[in-house]
Swiss-Prot record:
<comment type="similarity">
    <text>Belongs to the long chain scorpion toxin family. Class 3 subfamily.</text>
</comment>
<feature type="disulfide bond">
    <location>
        <begin position="68"/>
        <end position="87"/>
    </location>
</feature>
<dbReference type="GO" id="GO:0005576">
    <property type="term" value="C:extracellular region"/>
</dbReference>
<protein>
    <recommendedName>
        <fullName>Heteroscorpine-1</fullName>
    </recommendedName>
</protein>
<dbReference type="Pfam" id="PF14866">
    <property type="entry name" value="Scorpion_toxin_alpha-beta"/>
</dbReference>
<feature type="disulfide bond">
    <location>
        <begin position="72"/>
        <end position="89"/>
    </location>
</feature>
<feature type="disulfide bond">
    <location>
        <begin position="58"/>
        <end position="82"/>
    </location>
</feature>
<keyword id="KW-0800">Toxin</keyword>
<keyword id="KW-1015">Disulfide bond</keyword>
<feature type="signal peptide">
    <location>
        <begin position="1"/>
        <end position="19"/>
    </location>
</feature>
<keyword id="KW-0732">Signal</keyword>
<feature type="domain" description="BetaSPN-type CS-alpha/beta">
    <location>
        <begin position="55"/>
        <end position="95"/>
    </location>
</feature>
<dbReference type="GO" id="GO:0090729">
    <property type="term" value="F:toxin activity"/>
</dbReference>
<keyword id="KW-0929">Antimicrobial</keyword>
<dbReference type="GO" id="GO:0042742">
    <property type="term" value="P:defense response to bacterium"/>
</dbReference>
<keyword id="KW-0044">Antibiotic</keyword>
<comment type="function">
    <text>Has antibacterial activity against B.subtilis, K.pneumoniae and P.aeruginosa.</text>
</comment>
C-alpha cells in the first residue's frame, strides 16, 4: 500500500511539473527528501527531468495537447510529429 501511494504521489508531481505549476528543481528536492539520493531517487529524478523538459508535451510519440502540431504549423506550415518526447516538423515516424 505504501509503495502504491508513493507511486501515485510521484506521478502527480510529474504531472504538475509538466504543466509548469511548480518547477522541476522543487520536485527534485522533494524526491531527495522522500526517497533519498540513491539509485531509485536518481531514476525518479531522471524521469521527472525527461518529462518536465518537453515543451511541446510529446509523450511516447503522442502529441497529448496538440502543441507540436500548432508549433509546426506556425513555424514551417508542415505537420508536426512526436518522436518520443521531441517534436519534429514534417518528419513522420518511419517505423
Amino acid at each position: 500500500m505504501n509503495s502504491k501511494l508513493t507511486a501515485l504521489i510521484f506521478l502527480g508531481l510529474v504531472a504538475i511539473a509538466s504543466c509548469g505549476w511548480i518547477n522541476e528543481e522543487k520536485i527534485q528536492k522533494k524526491i531527495d527528501e522522500k526517497i533519498g539520493n540513491n539509485i531509485l531517487g536518481g531514476m525518479a529524478k531522471a524521469v521527472v527531468h525527461k518529462l518536465a523538459k518537453g515543451e511541446f508535451q510529446c509523450v511516447a510519440n503522442i502529441d497529448t495537447m496538440g502543441n507540436c502540431e500548432t508549433h509546426c504549423q506556425k513555424t514551417s506550415g508542415e505537420k508536426g510529429f512526436c518522436h518520443g518526447t521531441k517534436c519534429k516538423c514534417g518528419k513522420p515516424l518511419s517505423y
